[in-house]
Amino acid sequence: MEEFQGYLEKYRSRRQYFLYPLLFQEYIYTIAHGHGLNGSSKIEPVEFFGYDNKSSLVLVKRLITRMYQQNCLVYSINDSNQNRFIGRDLFFYSPLFFQMVSEGFAAIVEIPFSLQLGFSFKEKEIQKYHNLRSIHSIFPFLEDKFSHLNYVSEILIPHPIHTETLVQILQCWVQDVPSLHFLRFFLHKYDNWNSFIIPNKSSYAFSKENKKLFWFFYNSYVFEFEFLVVXLRKQSYYLQSTSFGXFLXRRNFYGKMEHLINVCRNYSQKTLRFFKDPFMHYIRYQGKAILASRDTHILMKKWKCYLVNFWQYYFHFWSYSYRIHINQLKNHSFLLGGYFSSVLINPLAVKNKMLDHSFLIDTVTKKFDTTIPVIPLIGSLSKAKFCTVLGHPNSKTIWADLSDSDIVGRFGRICRNLSHYYSGSSKKQSLYRIKYXXRLSCARTLARKHKRTIRALLQRLGTGFLEEFFTEEEQVLSLIFPKTTIPFPLYGLHRERIWNLDIIRIDDLVNHLDWP
């Protein structure tokens, strides 16, 4: 952040939004290539595929030189000279250029957010990440609230949004006209923008390319949607823009929407007066939102109709009603945050005796339950080439050139992360199949490297060389629960539910499950 202090002071004193000149500064791309504005980002640094750190500075200088040549932009706008332009400056239109500019622009566009929010946090001595909670904090909220609700509406937030709409949304925050014009040109000229803003399931989970700019635009769009439609008391702008890069591991977590009509009196009062419900709850994680209510099915259908019309008239694109599913909680389970969540109903008969008479009282208890989506998780493993679609382990061929310790370490981290994340499940037995596939995949990879059979490899190394990272989670759990609770060291641990509140980013394999 220190690199920007001189420019930011000038920025604040003049009250102008001159961000466009920063596109021609080398240190912008250096910061974008590293950890971002905050200097100590909590996510992995951005990786530029196709070149290493030593040659990155040379490519940045070449990029700035091309951008200084205004003829390149003139040629690119004229379609008749497109062949001449491509033959002359192929680098300017290469995927590498697209990636470098997108990361640099993502770093630049954070400046208005840092000015409006970063300095206020410093003046008020508010912790920077006070609103960034653990992913697992959403599930204790569901345990407390959802057992008393009746209907749930699953909303897949649509994202085939026009690029001009994104620019107009950003215009509320960035008032630098040249930067907005450059953004229009940048988004208009690249045919792969649709694949950039709409990540498919295969490329999203296992590719780090262009994520920072994608998350910035996506969260700006979602903020606009939530601010105008849901009108919650706590809104997304409390998360400063330096957190947009780390937002791939975050989720907006909101509580109860009470007396919605009082908040939105000046906005579509005739429409919103039908939606007053003190027991309506809204939760969003990435591209999926949950609306739950204790009211009737008619209210949920009104919300569904309202959302479809809102996307059509405000964001100017058609959203199909099948993207919103309304179900009863007692008969339905929904996928959120990598878990299948549902409300279990347990009938209970209580015998009550008064003098010479006895009565049987039938009661019903509701319990919020979370299970592991085994089949989708195996599908994620198969797409990552760890196993087949049926769950049979494969060797990870691209890891065969690594050392034995690196291979075992990578498989161990995958298993530990999955065990750590799914510690909140009430049925952990289903996770054993995932561990089995990862364990044999590790053994097959080592056998492929040493050109041996799995049996010969295990005989030489011993069967216990893979046990450490598979049993570490159980050993930790056995230390948490006293022996009075669990008579035997590891007996019944699969029934214990623990929400680890130190999880700040979701595993790629789990993250892959929630995208529509």
UniProtKB/Swiss-Prot annotation:
GO terms for biological process: mRNA processing; RNA splicing; tRNA processing. GO terms for molecular function: RNA binding. GO terms for cellular component: chloroplast. It is found in: Plastid, Chloroplast. Transmembrane segments: none annotated. Keywords: Chloroplast, mRNA processing, Plastid, RNA-binding, tRNA processing. Belongs to the intron maturase 2 family. MatK subfamily. Usually encoded in the trnK tRNA gene intron. Probably assists in splicing its own and other chloroplast group II introns. This is Maturase K. The gene is matK.
